């Protein structure tokens, strides 16, 4: 509502504030309050199920190198490698990186092929708070292998720990 509209209705400043306050209270009573923009481990598992198309996840082959404690979550170094011969019949097709408690659980997806030589990468990721990082690798035979690593964040990506 603009100032001109308020003046047309002959409302005082006090009445406008009262109506606005009543609106906020009504919204709060009906559950229309802002929620924390954070994913849950349940949402990360749901996203992982989408990425794997419901396939069974097997432990092994995937190695995550991640600091146990990072001072700044906005640029956490992560190294991922997948043990694969990378031949025409046995290679890594894709690697997906997820963070259980980031606003958007899926951090990155990388594609590989037999000519990649190695299924390995190093990058920096944003970690909102202390949480578990999940890496899933899709193999050429359609199977999925995964690993998890815990990272404690002293100061998160948003400036909070």
Language model: regions and residue ranges:
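Short acidic/polar inter-strand loop motif in beta-rich domains
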Residues: 140-146
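Twin-arginine (Tat) signal peptide motif
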Residues: 8-17, 35
């Amino acid at each position: 509502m603009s100032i001109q509209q308020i003046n047309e209705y002959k409302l005082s400043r006090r009445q406008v504030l009262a109506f606005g306050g009543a609106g906020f209270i009504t919204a709060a009573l009906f559950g229309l309050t802002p929620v924390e923009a954070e994913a849950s481990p349940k949402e990360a598992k749901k996203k992982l199920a989408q990425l794997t198309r419901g396939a069974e996840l097997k432990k092994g082959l995937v190695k995550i190198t991640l600091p146990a404690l990072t001072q700044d979550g906005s640029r956490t170094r992560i190294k991922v490698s997948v043990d694969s011969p990378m031949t025409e019949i046995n290679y890594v097709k894709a690697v997906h990186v997820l963070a259980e408690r980031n606003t958007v659980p899926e951090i990155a997806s990388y594609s590989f092929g037999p000519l990649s030589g190695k299924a390995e990468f190093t990058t920096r990721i944003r970690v909102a708070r202390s949480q578990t990082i999940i890496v899933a690798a899709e193999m050429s035979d359609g199977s999925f292998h995964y690993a998890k690593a815990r990272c404690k964040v002293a100061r998160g990506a948003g400036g909070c720990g």
